[in-house]
Amino acid sequence: MKPSEPKSVPSSFFDETFRQSSDPWRYTSNFYEISKFRTTIKCLPKVQFKNAFEIGCAIGVLTQKLAKKCDRLLSVDYSEVGLEEARKRCADLPQVRFEQMQIPQQFPTEKFDLILFSEVGYYLTMPDLLIAKQKIIDQLLPGGYLLMVHFRYPVESFILNGDIVHDTFIQESAQFLKHLGDPRQQKFWIDIRGYHKRYRMDLFQRL
């Protein structure tokens, strides 16, 4: 019998994770996560964006910070349980819209000048990652930006790892995306705690 093909991590995994804890990855209390979110916002290539798309918003901690840079922001997650917390957290941000989506099977049809693909790609199989990549390219406006952020090391629930996710975009998208490198390197920051080594960050611009 042929072994079954691996599948991307389902929404039920994230629903159960958020039922067990309202903040399972300690976004609000872990200094590594707090520092990473702060760095992500500082590495945005523009002061303000007209229409942004956040893939994998979880409970909306980064969404709160990102919304200040966006006239409109669509934030999606696999988990409706996580989105309930996100909606409460961002209730005073009228420019933010939340939707439950199973990326890449579900994907918005509108165009964006910023797409943030953060800590999601390694939950996908390679075929699904390639589909997501193409849909991101299709919905990114010419001159628009894609910022990717992913943890680099193995975790039991991951199908891929952060380096594979980012390298796939670099190697497979040169015709459509200009790779601008790691924006942290342009800031000349001193990474005293060594946090930057733990996650990958790459910025792209749509050709």
What name fits each language-model region?
Residues 1-47, 51-55, 59-110, 124-138, ...:
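Class I (Rossmann-like) S-adenosyl-L-methionine-dependent methyltransferase catalytic domain
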Residues 116:
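A conserved beta-strand element that flanks and buttresses the S-adenosyl-L-methionine
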Residues 120:
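Hydrophobic adenine-recognition pocket in adenosine-nucleotide-binding enzymes
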